[in-house]
Amino acid sequence: MENITLDQYLQSAVDVVKEIGPMILKNYNSRSKQIEYKGAIDLVTDTDKAVEEHIIKTLTTKYPHTKILGEESTKDGIYNWGNEPTWVIDPIDGTTNFVHRFPLFCVSIALSINKEIVVACLYAPVLDELFTATKGGGAFLNGESISVSSVEHLSQSIISTNVGYDRSDKGIEFMLTNFKNILKDNVQALRFSGTAAWEMASVSCGRVDSFYEWGIHPWDIAAASLLITEAGGVVVDPSGGKCDMESRKVLCGNPNIVNKLSKLLIEKPTSN
């Protein structure tokens, strides 16, 4: 295998998201979408599948030594994620938004080596926003260097999260308890956009001060997690401990706000 730089991997990811952008926008504007249900409210479209297939074919043809961990190609929740160079792909994060022509959704591509994210490329086609990062190389939005916010107090902060797919009584009670804990501490605003990857990207450029969620997958947060750390933020477990991307939970943001939020958020109870 030739000596491939992180910048070369990144450029390949950028090229492929820009290549498929027009097709995504065309399908986004169409009122006729082929929709399947992975669960009661969890959607997948023909566009999700076509985008992932194109990304996989393009990147593995150019880099045959790389593996794939993709949302639509991963079955039964088994993460085939080892030490080999692995592309972690979410073809459309925010599929429900995409289906309803709500403009917040994105394509997310990360490269993991030894299970560490070293390349991040996240593209929001409607907004034409391209977030990029390499390990140790900083984070960028449309080529301009970005950083997380410097807000110190919760009363001045915007917190972002999502309601997720758990609509059981216990799941709703857990969600509302955390909302109450946060709002009681007088955060300035609480936001829900329906796309974890884009919300975390918004953290990386300082639009949002912190994001948390339970129920996410590695492909939802892989690229955005590198954006945040390269922009000076932290990505942790909601308790404040080390983040495990396979644990399906995350808290991230500027260190001041993350530290305060970790003391307010309760842990989700395990299902019986």
UniProtKB/Swiss-Prot annotation:
Keywords: Cytoplasm, Hydrolase, Lithium, Magnesium, Metal-binding. This is Inositol monophosphatase. One of its GO terms (molecular function) is inositol monophosphate phosphatase activity. It is an enzyme of class 3 (hydrolase). Belongs to the inositol monophosphatase superfamily. It comes from Dictyostelium discoideum (Social amoeba). Responsible for the provision of inositol required for synthesis of phosphatidylinositol and polyphosphoinositides. Has broad substrate specificity and can use myo-inositol monophosphates, myo-inositol 1,3-diphosphate, myo-inositol 1,4-diphosphate, scyllo-inositol-phosphate, D-galactose 1-phosphate, glucose-1-phosphate, glucose-6-phosphate, fructose-1-phosphate, beta-glycerophosphate, and 2'-AMP as substrates. PROSITE patterns: IMP_1 (PS00629), IMP_2 (PS00630). The gene is impa1. Substrate binds at E71, I92, D93, G94, T95, G194, T195, A196, E213, D220.
